[in-house]
Amino acid sequence: MFANYSPFYDRAGIAIYHADCLAVLPFFPSESIDCVITDPPYLVNYRGRWDAKLQAIAGDGESSWVQPAFAEIYRVLKENAFCISFYGWPHADIFVGTWKSIGFRPVSHLAFIRRQWGLGRYSRSRHETAFLLAKGHPPLPKQAIADVIEWDGEPEKFHPNQKPLDSIYPLLKCFVPESGVVLDPFMGSGSTLRAAKDFGLRAVGIEIEENYCRIAVNRLAQDILFS
């Protein structure tokens, strides 16, 4: 899809690059992406001790990548467009400070409520959060999205931070223009790309772990949900 870098997968408007996003994004043309939906490492040094199938998350132990990665994300995103990024609340200051410093404007905050409770020392987590970030002044959506979205767990989990497709669908519907291109530079197991395929959108994913690239390809091979 982009010159000088061979995709791991490229079919029917969906491309996957097996690489660090900082190695691939410089090859993307400026202002070539209509919307970014991503779930980057939370900087909490995650270890999946409770499930041997789920690996540690690359880049989760340090923050040096945050500024250069989001600077590239900002560059490739079109003017007057949105980036929706999940983040880890223990280091919200790093994420929010970085986003503002490179030009993003936080315009809304979204909470995703799980039916199942997580673990915790002081409180048991039941939600995850994302910022809606604007580059420039995007047009208002035809119908504003609710800032609290409930989700069920996925029937099969491939990644420790995997987001259900039902959490991605309303974001695509509200913030991605028709026939737009969606970017997920921290693709994981490919939920953003799978959801984009269901909506008939073009999408690009970047993932540093080859195993997750293969999982995403397998998920893309399944029948589309909508027709």
Regions found by a protein language model. Give the residues of each.
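C-terminal helical cap(s) of enzyme catalytic domains, especially alpha/beta-barrels
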Residues: V204, C213-S227
